[in-house]
Amino acid sequence: MKRILSTVVGLILSGSIAFATEAAPDCIANGQVLPVNNEQVLQWKNNTKNQYKNRGHIYGVVSKIYQGKKSHQHFQVKLADGPRDTIEVIYNTSFNEIDNLKVGAVVESCGDYITSNARTGHYPASPDGAILHWVHESTNSARHESGYVVVDGVLHGMPHGRPFYDYEWEPNFDSLAPAM
């Protein structure tokens, strides 16, 4: 934990952060822009039944990368200071692999939230008790709104690197900064 916080603090204090390298899209939920909702996501994780679904827009730090997955990259994102304040993000590698994914990376992601604290069909429970998936451009907009993953300022989830929107994106580290 100290390593993650010191990494975040170092990034905050660094005047040469190169994060605005690509534009991040708005996170859309039911046709409206959804702000980062880490607190709401953690409330859903702790207070809803298995398979509860909603729209999530998270901002945090990669704290673990799950190995042994084939067509998807699975990784844990720390959303707050509590030991279980995490979510598993599941990214479809058919939109290219996230080549800059590493523990300590700063992540913003938008996608479909699902409480996953028990096996459902052939899907095991998430080790984090909740997942964020469909974090890429939607191939079926009637079923899913598009999502994305930004890792250390690089946008992922768009085919062939096509930008989603064209505007400046600036990370907000305020919610991750330790209390002074």
Where in this protein do the model-derived segments appear?
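Positively charged n-region of N-terminal signal peptides that target proteins for export
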Residues: 1-4
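Bacterial N-terminal signal peptides
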Residues: 7-16
